[in-house]
Amino acid sequence: MFNFTRQYSVKDGLITDELASHIVENLPARYASAETWKRIYSLQHDGASLQTMYLACEKEKARSGHPKGACILAVRDTDGDVFGVFIPDYLIPAPHYFGSEETFLWKYFPPKKYVHYPFVGNSNFVAYCTKSFLAFGGGNGRYSLWLDGSLEYAYSSRTPAFENNPLSYRGCPDQRIQIVDIELWVLE
């Protein structure tokens, strides 16, 4: 079993030890050895605001002194499914797409079903952060994961960037997903 240190006590957090062990199996080697996973944003504790999440990233970037940070975004929907993304960058608004081939999507359906979608490179649309939405993957007019600025809902569709199935268990592309919780973690 993978052991990691949590910066905060997260008794009911989205990333359980079991889920963390699945994510670690897919992390690039330089991040898989991270000993500390620090939660820098939680919708339940910090409020439903994309701007607050971006501000948490900016503060962490300034604190760490590193231009890039390894982030794990976890989302829980009203069906209880948890899904998200690993990206080796801070989530900060930019006027263009950013990210690398190390980025991947994942979904976790209790009990114990984990699916990993690596970046396949059929487009350069990895991540796009704006003041009004946050998106991962792109192409054909869709996003692999799109979250609105109020963090109340999301959409998920198959895209050329990840060739993923929709991340919500319902599996219906372009159907609104109601968000219950979001957490953003950085690896140190």
From Swiss-Prot:
Matching PROSITE patterns: TLDC
Cellular component aspect of the GO annotation: cytosol; mitochondrion; nucleus; proton-transporting V-type ATPase complex
Cell location: Mitochondrion; Cytoplasm; Nucleus
Keyword Aminoacyl-tRNA synthetase: no
Any GO molecular function: ATPase inhibitor activity
Residue ranges of domain TLDc in the record: 13-188
Keywords: Cytoplasm, Meiosis, Mitochondrion, Nucleus
A GO BP entry: regulation of cellular pH
Family (UniProt): Belongs to the OXR1 family.
Biological role stated in the UniProt entry: May be involved in protection from oxidative damage. Has a role in meiosis.
Protein name (Swiss-Prot/TrEMBL): Oxidation resistance protein 1
Organism: Schizosaccharomyces pombe (strain 972 / ATCC 24843)
Gene name of this polypeptide: oxr1
